[in-house]
Amino acid sequence: MTETAFLKLFVAIVITFILVLPEFFKTPKERTLELSCLEVCFLPNSTYPLSSFNFSSVAFLQPAEETQTIMGILPNHSSFQSFAEICQGITSGLPMCSLCLVCESKGDVDFTSQEQTSKGLVMRGSKEVKASDFYSPCEYFNVTVALLADPVKEDTTCTPEGHPGEAIALDEDPVREKSLNHTCRFMKNTDNCTHIFLHLEMDVKSVTCSMKITWYVLVLFVFMLGIIFIIYKILEEHRRVWRRQSHNYKSSSVLFRGHDSGKLSTLNVRVIPGYPWTIWTRDFDE
């Protein structure tokens, strides 16, 4: 590979590196989640469906984060009256019941990536009312959202485990969600608003993993290419110096040979004893 072709390849890789770089720092886009929720009260031997409602929220979803919190407000909604009536019918042995909020999305929730196969959104969670919130004018829902590959086949039921005098824990999918503690209490003045806290859990490990692998391979490739380029330049400089020195040596050798061929012939004088004359002889050097 010639030096010109090598430089062209290096420039092309650097340009590709610069073009791919903004993809890792782009601003998240707005996504609207429209959910249809159903409140269900779970008792040890029966299940009571409560009122349903719709919920819409504009969220800034960042695929690089696995968990996000979205807060929405539903004014003028309260199903706690019917829920309280159901709880009043419980015997004194089990003075508590659990509420499971099951939600499903109406629109497209393919917000993680085009490669994401999830087409549905199922939420599970609970109503949790603490003693300090006994006279609170709002109902508080703490809901966990999980992307599901096939929400139709997913089991959205909650199995309560009742213990007298204690909060009831819902045994849910241990892979996707964690168990939550739920307490059924009576609240007053619940006609004003309902606060929904959504903890969105996105399955983005596969997407971010491929992005990180591509990023690291690209950085490593550019780094190795830079090292090869530096080594190539060093060897080229050494080769150029060696050629210059070899050329100078050849030039001086040719000049030295030219001077030897043009040397003058020397005369040798031999003297023979006993003779009054001297013999002059000439030796010619080729």
From Swiss-Prot:
It is a multi-pass membrane protein. The chain crosses the membrane at residues 5-25, 215-235. GO terms for cellular component: membrane. It comes from the Eukaryota. Keywords: Glycoprotein, Membrane, Transmembrane, Transmembrane helix. It is found in: Membrane. Its main location: membrane. Residues 1-4, 236-286 are cytoplasmic. Glycans are attached at N45, N54, N76, N142. Pfam families: TMEM156. The keyword Hydrolase does not apply. Residues 26-214 are extracellular. InterPro entries: TMEM156. PANTHER family: TRANSMEMBRANE PROTEIN 156 (PTHR14788:SF5). This is Transmembrane protein 156. It comes from Rattus norvegicus (Rat).
